[in-house]
Curated annotation (Swiss-Prot):
Keywords: Cytoplasm, Exonuclease, Hydrolase, Nuclease, RNA-binding. This is Exoribonuclease 2. Residues 190-519 form the RNB domain. It is an enzyme of class 3 (hydrolase). Disulfide bonds: none annotated. InterPro entries: CSD, NA-bd_OB-fold, RNase_B_OB_dom, RNase_II, RNase_II/R, RNase_II/R_CS, RNase_II/RNase_R, RNR_Ribonuclease. It comes from Erwinia tasmaniensis (strain DSM 17950 / CFBP 7177 / CIP 109463 / NCPPB 4357 / Et1/99). GO terms for biological process: mRNA catabolic process. GO terms for cellular component: cytosol. It is found in: Cytoplasm.
Length: 647
């Protein structure tokens, strides 16, 4: 009788339209209940029974109901699931499989089965890639997934690497493509510079040497520098299968312990590598520098043959320069010694030029994991940037500035690294934060390159980096662009890299553009899709490096958990839940929960906006503070380190 009743249908529609609904993101907790976060200020409680229908991170539309004195959210429609493709660990019970996603807030096992194409016989503890197939808000009774790829077994010591690469959908191996053995006929004249004592300076273990340097005294304090860069585009044809593979990978992926090259190792580590006493084709740049480090306008790009006369290591060169030539290591002849002395002079002049006309990053050490046969962490070495590192850095930055200028002036395009500092709105916010701390900044001025440079110099002169950390969050991210633009972070009008073509596809593209200029040929602008792809790949590679690092740091610091061993740590972030710190001696990041900071929660304010922790109205900690901590706990399942401040 009520079937197809238009009045009833109307009433249902009216009730549905009048029921309050909100859209937000589900935030799970370890206690079964959750919250629907609508924005930074507003969230609704989700009771445990309703949480069974959703997963942490799902974007949903929910009905708001009143339950006693509070409003609760009942998820109704799935807008965007948190999980689509994911990695996790397989569980097996009575031959039935389930998978627990590898995520700190996803603890529930999801029923699953292998996809038909996957032939592996899954066992408990195996790592796998899975894809979600069913979701309760899509009309299904339960969550359900299919296993699409076996990663590795529970016992594999190299699981941190394989799991991370699978999570980010990155390659495990070097490209499996036929390696070209002979050079292309590029109709390119090459100068023979094999008699000049070029040198490479790298880590002792480096095999893919892609830059060599030669410098001579030009009189009156001036120097002439030739930067010679390995030439993979002399072997890799545009549009070839190998070119497509390199474009897809975009970068060599450097992870703790090993790298996954962009090009086949035979090319990157041998045929193109600027090995000592081997004749190699290069793309080169000739630059004249005044005594104060200013480059002349007669920059010349050209193709050449060179022969590296020495493979030098950063630490050897630094030791020799820092001890005035009395270190255990000595250059093999006077020609090499003279090159090192002249390169040191060039480095000091260029460093002063950049201090005055651009911006120089503050030195932070790199941390290198010393690994055993089974992937165990034997030690973590802090590698500080020394004079030899700075010689190479200054030479490469100079060469990249020259390429950026030539590409801009001759073509109007290339692969550029662009960083635009503050946009208008963020400049206003940054200026307001600075004003609160007694620093006057004009929002319009700091949105310009010159104004940004002046602000950075002013902040760098302050006794702490606190203010710098406060305004950094208002800055835009660096991006890859085919159009020339400024790089505020470096304080430069334009910056285009070409000095690492073995490791970066964008540098290969710039090589081809520079060669076209040398030959007087026309060039097509690189596709914008390429710059987007490169930016995404760079993000994935950095996340993979961070994830493997988190795993290895957790392994390494397990032995310190619960002990009295003290670590000096820098406060790097404050959130409602506590503080994040970075251990100074090894670079590990640890979390200090709020209850470890102060027992009485109501007496404490943890403010992300202010970058500080206040206790009873007084600032107790703030970002950039150095404090002492002990390791309270290491949670291997989430690769997280929990620290406690030393009272």
């Amino acid at each position: 009788m009520f079937q197809d009743n238009p009045l009833l249908a109307q009433l249902k529609e009216k009730l549905h339209s009048q029921t309050p609904r909100v859209e937000g993101v589900v935030k799970g907790t370890e206690k079964g209940f959750g919250f629907l976060e609508v924005d930074a200020q507003k969230s609704y409680f989700i009771p445990p029974p309703f949480m069974k229908k959703v997963m942490h991170g799902d974007r949903v539309s929910a009905v708001i109901q009143s339950d006693k004195d509070r409003e609760v959210a009942d998820p109704e429609t799935l807008i965007e699931p948190f999980l689509t493709r994911f990695v996790g660990r397989v569980q097996k019970k009575d031959d039935r499989l389930s998978i627990i996603p590898d995520h700190p807030l996803l603890k529930d096992a999801i029923q699953c089965r292998p996809e038909r194409s996957v032939k592996h016989d899954f066992q408990a503890g195996d790592w796998a890639v899975a894809e979600m197939r069913r979701h309760p808000l899509k009309g299904d009774r339960t969550f359900y997934a299919e296993l699409t790829e076996f990663i590795t077994t529970a016992e594999d010591h190299l699981a941190p690497w394989w799991v991370t690469l699978s999570r980010h959908n990155l390659e495990r191996e070097a490209p499996d493509v036929t390696t070209p053995q002979s050079m292309l006929d590029e109709q390119l004249e090459r100068e023979d510079l094999t008699s000049l004592p070029f040198v490479t300076i790298d880590s002792a273990s480096t095999e893919d040497m892609d830059d060599a340097l030669y410098v001579e005294d030009a009189g009156n304090g001036a120097l002439k520098l030739i930067v010679a860069i390995a030439d993979p585009t002399a072997y890799v044809p545009v549009g070839s299968k190998l070119d497509a593979v390199a474009a897809e990978r975009a970068f060599t992926n450097y992870l703790p312990g090993f790298n996954i090259p962009m090009l086949p190792r035979q090319l990157s580590d041998d045929i193109c590598s600027l090995r000592p006493h081997e004749r190699r084709p290069v793309l080169a740049c000739r630059i004249t520098l005044a005594a104060d480090g200013t480059p002349a306008d007669d920059v010349q790009f050209f193709a050449a043959w060179i022969e590296s006369h020495a493979k030098l290591a950063y630490n050897d060169v630094s030791d020799w320069l820092e001890t005035g030539g009395s270190s255990a290591w000595q250059p093999e002849n006077e020609a090499i010694a003279n090159q090192i002395r002249l390169l040191n002079r060039l480095c000091l002049a260029r460093s002063e030029w950049r201090q005055a006309h651009a911006l120089v990053f503050k030195d932070r050490p790199d941390f290198r994991f010393l690994l055993g046969e089974k992937g165990e962490v034997l030690d973590i070495i802090a590698e500080h940037r020394r004079i030899a590192n700075r010689i190479v850095e200054e030479s490469m930055i100079l060469a990249n500035i020259c390429a950026a200028t030539v590409l801009r002036d001759r073509l109007g395009f290339g692969i550029y690294n662009v960083h635009l500092g503050f946009d208008e709105a963020n400049a206003e916010q940054a200026a307001a934060v600075l004003a609160n701390h007694g620093v006057t900044a004009d929002p319009l001025a700091i949105a310009t390159l010159e104004g940004f440079r002046n602000l950075r110099r002013e902040l760098d002169a302050l006794p702490t980096q606190f203010l710098d950390s406060r305004i950094r969050r208002f800055q835009s991210f660096a991006e890859v662009s085919t159009t020339p633009g400024p790089h505020f972070g470096l304080g430069l009008e334009a910056y285009a890299t070409w000095t690492s073509p073995i490791r970066k596809y964008g540098d290969m593209v710039n090589h081809r553009l520079l060669k076209a200029i040398i030959k007087g040929e026309q060039s097509a602008r690189p596709a914008d899709e390429l710059s987007l792809k490169m930016a995404e790949r760079r993000r994935q590679n950095r996340m993979a490096e961070r994830d493997v690092g988190d795993w290895l740091y957790s392994r390494f610091l397990q032995k310190a958990a619960g002990s009295e061993q003290r670590f000096s740590a820098e406060v790097i972030d404050v959130s409602r839940g506590g503080m994040r710190v970075r251990l100074q001696e090894n670079g590990a990041v640890a979390f200090i929960p709020a209850p470890f900071i102060h027992a009485v929660r109501d007496e404490m304010v943890c403010s992300n906006e202010n970058g500080s922790v206040q206790i009873k109205g007084e600032v107790a900690y703030r970002v950039t503070d150095l404090i002492e901590v002990t390791i309270a706990e290491v949670r291997m399942e989430t690769r997280s380190i929990v620290a406690r401040p030393v009272a």
